[in-house]
From Swiss-Prot:
Disulfide bonds: none annotated. PANTHER family: MONODICTYPHENONE CLUSTER TRANSCRIPTION FACTOR-RELATED, OLEATE-ACTIVATED TRANSCRIPTION FACTOR 1-RELATED. This is Transcription factor phiO. Coiled coil: none annotated. Transmembrane segments: none annotated. Phomoidrides A and B (also known as CP-225,917 and CP-263,114) are potent inhibitors of Ras farnesyltransferase and squalene synthase. CP-225,917 and CP-263,114 inhibit Ras farnesyl transferase from rat brain with IC(50) values of 6 uM and 20 uoM, respectively. CP-225,917 inhibits squalene synthase with an IC(50) value of 43 uM and CP-263,114 with an IC(50) of 160 uM. GO terms for cellular component: nucleus. The keyword Membrane does not apply. It comes from the Eukaryota. Residues 12-39 bind DNA. Transcription factor; part of the gene cluster that mediates the biosynthesis of the antihypercholesterolemic agents phomoidrides which are dimeric anhydrides. Probably regulates the expression of the genes from the cluster. It is found in: Nucleus.
Length: 440
């Protein structure tokens, strides 16, 4: 005959707090059995049994009276038998202190040490709860937590009248919609810390260091309605003089490098709309200013706070400069019947061979006027002077691009640095192809 497992006796917390003896084969609350826990009064755990009562001669009159009250309650529990965890009606008012614990095995602790006939006071019943459970900014979490507390109270006390005494019912619930357990959204609590909306990124060098660069964020105010190397830029959203007001005050960088470069390019784009795009003097002046600003950016500690994105931005500026030089120095639209933008989209080899075969000479006479004081230089003298000036500028631009490429290689290799390397290498190859074309 197999040995029977020990039966789960009465709950340890209730019996041990009241110092009652185990009812042996008649469990009282069956809390241990419902929670699938082993009762401390089991045969396998003899050390968890309650302590014996003191000697009869050491008892006082008060302790004798208290023992009689406990025996009366024990008899009432035995009369209930296996009626579950619902206490008898005459004992529901006697517990005066209900402690809520985090341990599911100790959800409620009945303290019979304080017997009073007054109403139950739940002022300290929820002392272990965190305030965020009561004033939670998420309505679903409040509804879930409040409904769970209500179910716990109803299952433990056997009555719904105690819900009105919970602190959550008067602080976090609306009395008109208590059945739906929703919050009053018209007046949120002052203690809630609502998330602040993210401010829009303004056009500034510091904002580019935060968000990934793209055409609409880097060039938000450049025209795109004309056919030129600047056609990839977006339309202007504000006047160039208002760029200083768009600076973010949240970051202390104090740098105007990006703003200066893009304002100058915007001014050049406005000039291009009026028919002055093909002038060599304007293009050379813009190239010199941009090259100087690029050198300033490379030596600026504020601009290089996020070096990878800065180098990517500078690479885009240098590529745009090469586009402008190709467009103004190699006017091949009439000779080849194909615009420079279509040729730039082809492969580098076919692009180089097409330029070698079909490009016309530099349009010196039609594009600009060269004056020395009041004397106008024309003909071959003008062509030789402009060729020398343009070659010198392109060599200086090539030196700047070498410095930029060295800075990219020394920076940490990320996706931005790899993209900057690709852009600057392609622009450098196109620049040297242009220099070879000018040399003849």
């Amino acid at each position: 005959m197999s040995e029977k497992p020990p039966k789960i006796r009465s709950t340890c917390d209730a019996c041990q707090a009241a110092k009652l003896r185990c009812s042996r084969d008649k469990p009282r609350c069956r809390r241990c059995q419902n929670l699938n826990k082993e009762c401390v009064y089991s045969v396998s755990r003899p050390l968890g049994r309650p302590r014996r009562a003191p000697a009869e001669e050491a008892r006082t009159d008060d302790s004798t009276q208290g023992e009689g009250d406990m025996r009366t309650r024990e008899s009432s529990f035995e009369a209930n038998g296996s009626s579950g965890n619902i206490p008898s009606p005459h004992l529901s008012a006697s517990p005066t202190n209900i402690m809520v614990h985090d341990d599911p095995c100790k959800s409620l602790v009945w303290d019979d040490a304080l017997d009073t006939d007054g109403p139950m006071d739940f002022g300290s019943t929820l002392s272990d709860f965190d305030t965020s459970m009561i004033l939670d900014p998420v309505p679903d979490l409040i509804t879930h937590a409040t409904s769970s507390s209500t179910d716990l109270a109803a299952s433990s006390w056997g009555t719904d009248s105690s819900i009105a005494t919970l602190p959550t019912s008067s602080q976090a619930l609306d009395t008109k919609s208590k059945s739906t357990m929703n919050l009053d959204k018209s007046a949120p609590p002052e203690s809630l810390s609502l998330p602040m909306p993210t401010p829009p990124l303004s056009f500034e060098g510091t904002s580019m260091l935060i968000s990934p660069p793209n055409e609409t964020e880097i060039f938000p105010f450049l025209q795109s309605s004309f056919e030129s190397p600047l056609s990839n830029f977006a339309a202007p959203t504000s006047a160039p003089t208002e760029l200083s007001s768009l600076r973010s005050n949240s970051l202390d960088y104090g740098c105007n490098c990006y703003t200066t470069v893009l304002r100058r390019m915007h001014q050049f784009s406005l000039t291009s709309l009026k028919g002055g795009l093909s002038t060599i003097d304007e293009t050379m002046r813009l190239e010199k200013e941009i090259r100087g600003e690029v050198i300033t950016i490379l030596h600026c500690s504020s601009c290089t706070a996020n070096r990878q994105r800065v180098l990517l931005f500078v690479g885009i500026i240098m590529e745009t400069t090469v586009d402008m030089l190709e467009h103004v120095l190699l006017d091949d639209t009439a000779a080849s019947g194909q615009s420079i933008f279509d040729q730039l989209s082809s492969s580098p080899q076919s692009h180089r061979s097409k330029r070698t075969r079909t490009l016309s000479p530099l349009p010196y006479g039609e594009k600009t006027t060269l004056r020395l004081g009041t004397y106008e230089i024309d003909g071959e003298e003008k062509a030789g002077f402009l060729s020398f000036m343009i070659r010198s500028r392109l060599k200086e631009l090539s030196t700047t691009m070498r410095h930029l490429h060295t800075a990219i290689q020394q920076a940490q290799q990320t996706s931005n640095s790899k993209a900057a390397t690709t852009i600057i290498v392609e622009a450098f190859q196109r620049l040297h192809s242009l220099m070879r074309r000018l040399d003849g």
